UniProtKB/Swiss-Prot annotation:
It is found in: Cytoplasm. The keyword Metal-binding applies. This is Probable molybdenum cofactor guanylyltransferase. Belongs to the MobA family. One of its GO terms (cellular component) is cytoplasm. Its cofactor is Mg(2+). It holds the Pfam family NTP_transf_3. Its EC number is 2.7.7.77. The keyword Metal-binding applies. GO terms for biological process: Mo-molybdopterin cofactor biosynthetic process. Mg(2+) binds at D106.
């Protein structure tokens, strides 16, 4: 594993993380965020990783009680629809600072090193992780995007990638040795892969 260093410039700009936890887990067949891997719920693993980097970490969700076991501050989604862009909008609207880190709640293999790598390569207004695909829910977003996001939500356009194409963004190419940390747990097949990787590391 390579060694990562913190750049003061990046960290001074990004002190807050929002973990998005408002999805329905339809493809997984049960609530994936509450699924336990080695004695810890998926959302718990992601939250602890975020806490190891940021001064403030919030959970963005539709149900405050559901995540009470984390003893973490919960921000309730601004809209009823279950879409990632709703969580993003809620996070940016709640944010006190200009830039915040956004992290999907279904990344049980996420590591501090991956988060730091994205931070080190942060450029405004948006920087998101990239492997063979773009990971729009692992990155830094600016509050300046609020108006454009709201416009898209009102039109029923929930595509984050379309938003990024519109506003411009920076792709942070994740090193090969950290790419496994970006594996989403959407299905039971994903879970099998995640458990195999977890046992390997």
């Amino acid at each position: 594993m390579r060694t990562f260093t913190w750049r003061k410039g990046s960290l001074s700009k990004v002190n807050t993380c929002y973990v998005l936890a408002g999805g329905k887990s339809k493809r997984f067949g049960e609530d994936k965020l509450l699924y336990e891997i080695k004695g810890k719920k998926v959302i718990e693993r992601v939250y602890e990783t975020a806490k190891s980097v940021f001064k403030e970490v919030y959970i963005v969700a539709k149900d405050r009680e559901k995540f009470s076991f984390l003893n973490a501050p919960v921000v309730l989604d601004e809209f009823e629809e279950s879409a990632s862009i709703i969580g993003l909008y809620t996070a940016l609207k709640h944010a006190k600072e200009e830039n915040v880190f956004v992290l999907s709640g279904d990344l049980p293999l996420m590591k501090k090193e991956t988060v730091l790598y994205v931070l080190e390569n942060f450029k405004e207004p948006v920087s998101v992780a990239k492997t063979e695909k773009l990971h729009t829910l692992v990155g830094v977003y600016s509050k300046k995007l609020l108006e454009k996001i709201e416009e898209r939500i009102k039109k029923g356009d929930y595509r984050i990638w379309a938003l990024l194409k519109d506003v411009g963004y920076n792709e942070v190419e994740i090193p090969e040795e950290l790419r496994y940390t970006l594996l989403n747990m959407n299905t039971k097949e994903d879970l099998k892969r995640i458990l195999a990787i977890e046992n390997h590391y």
